[in-house]
Amino acid sequence: SSGEEKMYLYRDFELSSCVLRIIPYVGIDYEHYCMKGVKAILHGTYHSSTMAVTPYKDDESKRYTSQAILSLKKRCDECEPPIPLFLEHCHRDAYNYISTGIILKCGAIPVWTMTSEMTYVKLLVGCALGYEGEELKEFMNREINDEFVYRD
């Protein structure tokens, strides 16, 4: 345990399919994903916490290619309320990688302390408890029941 006071989940809540989990693959097209009913997105990374961020279809249009995670982040930001985009398993030094650094600087939220499965379940619970925005981010970064298995 992290030594912090434990958080107990005594409130009733109902899990729903409001977290979209995306596992990256070569040729992914983010236009194929529907955002209806989505409260949070959990996006995996390639090895070493890297991802495809090829920014533009062409330099003149400044439109993101639909195969770049930046296009997904833009869609998330345009939703009301904005949909938080969590990246997992995202190493603490991921800012050192150009590709991952770009998406993190654009506001994606790194998760590196938990397994993929635990991160997904915790996001489901956080959304079911009604957390959004900063509150959801704080919930994800607070250890509740020894779920943080990766440490410095």
Model-derived features with residue positions:
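Accessory alpha-helical/coil subdomains and C-terminal extensions
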Residues: 1-55, 62, 148-152
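C-terminal non-catalytic interaction/assembly regions of soluble proteins
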Residues: 48-152
